[in-house]
Amino acid sequence: LALDGATGELRAGAVRRGVREQDVSGGVALASSPLPEGRARFWFRDVQSGGDKIVVRQDRVIGPILSTMYSLNRNVLKMSAQLMPLSEREPRTVRLEVRSVGAEWREVAQSPWGGGYTALLRVDNWDSSRVWDYRVRYRDSAGIDHEHIGVVQSDPKDEPGFTIAHLSCVMPTARGLEGGTGEAEIPVAEPLGRYTSKNLHFPHTELIGNILSHKPRLLVCAGDQIYEGNPTSADAPDNPTLDYLYKWYLWAWAFRDLTRSTPTIVQTDDHDIYQGNLWGNGGRAAPTEIIDVSGRAERVRDQNRGGYVYGPEFINLVQRTQSGHNPDPYDPTPIEQDIGVNY
């Protein structure tokens, strides 16, 4: 049923009776996504559901710990825990506990969550000769404990070889969701549609299943984990942090069952920091130029002359969320604007 919020008048509704349980399996979602030529927009408030066919699955609830990634370099374990957005009034402490087979859990590290709602955990003198279970724990302001469980693999240094999975240029959709229905560009082509399996890649189920079938010992993500214009156009003011986190969460959510138990190295690239090209130029800010925007002069940064378009606060937040768990750099000295390094 859809009711007018002001008058309570019934606007639309449908009732089906005698529906078999297997015919209504799945989730329930509401979306406001009109075609580009449409002008109406909607929002939803106080959404409720009920009935014998509605089941709450706590094992499918997302958050507050969204995902983890880790790397193991000789005897140093580094792990990042990506949390969902939290109030500044919520507790800060995130804990890492581990256990070997048949043993009890014991705490080995703790860290406050910081920029990007990410906690960075570190354990020196790690025993890399064995496999360890781990859980990341977070206690919220209501005293409820939440956990995210995974496996730290042993160092494969004595194995004759191992498989590396390589990813880059990951897009949640083939075409942006604001671009209409995706009519075929040539007569013999099949249209993609909008909310179809041909257009929607997220949550990358087939891709991840194929990767897992190879049992990789290392996952390397070489850049463009996100695209600023996908699945929706970039909302990029002076600091596009909120828009970035939305798109980064899609990646972290989709790949979390892979990264929770596979050592992972992540390198950021141009689209991760909302640029179409990136020549770092020692960390300098990209020079500005004046362009015409709808009849008015506007000063913008020219990425193709080298440097960064956005400020160091945003750049470092992206690197923290994506690469904060990478092995220590050879030389941690930051480049200009105090931008961190990963090499």
Residue ranges of each PLM-predicted region?
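Noncatalytic modules at the cell exterior or secretory-pathway interfaces
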Residues: 25-27
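Metal-dependent phosphoester/phosphodiester hydrolase catalytic core
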Residues: 1, 6-9, 13, 17-23, ...
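Dinucleotide-binding Rossmann-like beta1-alpha1 core, especially the glycine-rich loop
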Residues: 30
